[in-house]
Amino acid sequence: MSKNDDILLFSLSNSHQLANKIANLLKIELSPIRIDKFADGELIVAPQVPVRGRRVIIIQSTSKPVNDSLMELLIAIDSIKRASAKAISVVIPYYGYARQDRKAKPREPITARLVAKMIESAGATSVLTWDIHSLQTQGFFDIPFDSLEAVWVLMKHYFSAYKDSSNITIVSPDYGGVKRAREISIATGATLAIVDKRRSGKNQVEINNVLGDVKDRDCVIVDDMIDTGGTILGAAKIVREKGAKSITIIATHGLFNNNARQHFQQAIKDRIINKICIADTIENEPFDGLEIVSIAPAIAKCIEIYSEGTGSMSFVHDENSKVLFAKKIY
């Protein structure tokens, strides 16, 4: 019996492309699942093969349409649990609602915790996600929860084009991303710069200054996601004004909300940005200057660890990041 014979892999509506890549790497077929919507908008999701006694993997990003994607996931978990699956592992490449992880103002909800409890109550036995916005979300779960860092996969892709890091500067677009940028800077030997950003209102960003030298440098602005793009575009503009030689945007999740795609395309045409590199946690149509790097191999490795019942998910992180630390990428 193959080590993957006990696994059933289901893809929901938001992650078909990624799930197909994972299935091909694991050399297994995606199992059929029915996803229908009634006239009133209600969803029905049900596996079309027996799942009794099997280990089940469900792949679904809870990105746009966020609420439909989340309900589809919850109903899928519930239907599979009621069909007597042995275990249900949920792979959520992009975890929606993670930014609502605290009460920023009086009377606001902590929706990240609510979503965690809904996933648990539906019947999930473990959760795997990538570059979750706030690591404290893992504390909202009472089941095994792993958030791995796809940013290392993206950094390996970027650095593969360079012989060394002598002219590269890692740029954090705000103070919230300094820890991530510093880790990459230390790992690669690149220098570090920080954009001094102040938020003046909802989706309103005021850029003040750059801390660190970016003049004539190949700059990499690193963030966990591209939402409306205001923060990253503002950072890119001031870094370019300060004399950067090139600017690459690296972000795990490409949400591209509102008119972000058009704004980034224009920024590339205007040579403010040279290119953008994202992971395929969310399905995106490519455009000139956008590179999409797949995390399917990393997820497939996680599923193999899960199916074998030995090892650690942190191995997948180490497998990507240790190459940078050892500087074997050059």
UniProtKB/Swiss-Prot annotation:
Family matches, as PROSITE patterns: PRPP_SYNTHASE (PS00114)
Amino-acid positions noted as binding D-ribose 5-phosphate in the UniProt annotation, renumbered to this chain: 199, 223, 227-231
Residues the record marks as active site: 197
Pfam family, one: Pribosyltran_N
A molecular-function term among this protein's GO annotations: magnesium ion binding
Binding site for ATP: 40-42, 99-100
GO terms under biological process: 5-phosphoribose 1-diphosphate biosynthetic process; purine nucleotide biosynthetic process; ribonucleoside monophosphate biosynthetic process
Cofactor(s) needed: Mg(2+)
Cited InterPro entries: PRib_PP_synth_CS (IPR000842), Pribosyltran_N (IPR029099), PRibTrfase_dom (IPR000836), PRTase-like (IPR029057), Rib-P_diPkinase (IPR005946), Rib-P_diPkinase_bac (IPR037515)
GO cellular component: cytoplasm; ribose phosphate diphosphokinase complex
Keyword line: ATP-binding, Cytoplasm, Kinase, Magnesium, Metal-binding, Nucleotide biosynthesis, Nucleotide-binding, Transferase
Entry EC no(s): 2.7.6.1
Cell location: Cytoplasm
Binding site for Mg(2+) 2: 174
Subunit structure comment from the entry: Homohexamer.
Function: Involved in the biosynthesis of the central metabolite phospho-alpha-D-ribosyl-1-pyrophosphate (PRPP) via the transfer of pyrophosphoryl group from ATP to 1-hydroxyl of ribose-5-phosphate (Rib-5-P).
Assigned protein family: Belongs to the ribose-phosphate pyrophosphokinase family. Class I subfamily.
Protein name (database record): Ribose-phosphate pyrophosphokinase
Source species: Ureaplasma parvum serovar 3 (strain ATCC 700970)
Gene: prs
